[in-house]
Amino acid sequence: MLYYVIKRLLGLIPTLFIVSVLVFLFVHMLPGDPARLIAGPEADAQVIELVRQQLGLDQPLYHQFWHYISNAVQGDFGLSMVSRRPVADEIASRFMPTLWLTITSMVWAVIFGMAAGIIAAVWRNRWPDRLSMTIAVSGISFPAFALGMFLIQVFSVELGWLPTVGADSWQHYILPSLTLGAAVAAVMARFTRASFVDVLSEDYMRTARAKGVSETWVVLKHGLRNAMIPVVTMMGLQFGFLLGGSIVVEKVFNWPGLGRLLVDSVEMRDYPVIQAEILLFSLEFILINLVVDVLYAAINPAIRYK
């Protein structure tokens, strides 16, 4: 197992290098001139050229790439073109709000999604199944930005129960986490149901029932563990999606996180911040997939990695 983990970690190096090259080329292909945006609409050509020199944009593209890669290897992603603060500080100040929002969304989505999926599988083709799957399909189909605006209108504007802007208290997390986790809970419910339906028809489940084991114990002990392997895969992918895909939700709720920072950076063509954030998201997905693979062995001891 240790050899497998080390091998996967070493595989990060070429993957992140390829991502770095693609991201660098992508951000420099974006339309618009960062120097013009920073200098302002009233700036003349001389001022814009001076800003370009200060930002290093007057140098050849290969020279900019080498400077970017050599510094990134040392953990230095440069200065933000907009705030002139270190990119690492910009990301660090926004990371925790996004992480806590992701964890909050994932916790309730897993609890309610798995519960709905198990109920739908146990009472298959009956009203609990139909009700759960109808809600799940609705959750998948409803756009996150529309759900967010609907929740703001009802619970903040009309009722005045919950705040909409900021991340200072636990009340601020309720509406964004509901919005962000709705689609994940819906996918979790459908995935859990499909996995449980297959498990419930296995021979060992019928054997447990024949031995007089209660249906609740059969479902929770024998069914849940064996149905968890594909569900854990989906959980890992969804967690990475939440962590890196909260852009729309953060924009709707003006959340001080990485998603909003990325949107603002794209609008201002802040190349260093864009490159660092996409690299961070790529690293998160790779590490989450590694954790999921390791969890396989914990859930099912029959699985071993060589």
Swiss-Prot record:
Bilayer topology annotation: Multi-pass membrane protein
Keyword Cell membrane tagged: yes
One Gene Ontology CC term in the entry: plasma membrane
Keyword rRNA-binding (UniProt): no
Residue ranges that the Swiss-Prot or TrEMBL entry lists as coiled coil: none
Source organism, top-level taxon: Bacteria
PROSITE patterns hit by this protein: ABC_TM1
Gene3D superfamilies referenced in this protein's UniProt entry, alphabetically: MetI-like
Membrane side Periplasmic: residue ranges: 30-102, 156-168, 250-277
Main location: membrane
Cytoplasmic side: 1-8, 124-134, 190-228, 299-306
InterPro entries: BPD_transp_1_N, MetI-like, MetI-like_sf
Record text on subunit structure and interactions: The complex is composed of two ATP-binding proteins (GsiA), two transmembrane proteins (GsiC and GsiD) and a solute-binding protein (GsiB).
PANTHER family: DIPEPTIDE TRANSPORT SYSTEM PERMEASE PROTEIN DPPB-RELATED, GLUTATHIONE TRANSPORT SYSTEM PERMEASE PROTEIN GSIC
Protein's name according to its UniProt entry: Glutathione transport system permease protein GsiC
Gene name of this polypeptide: gsiC
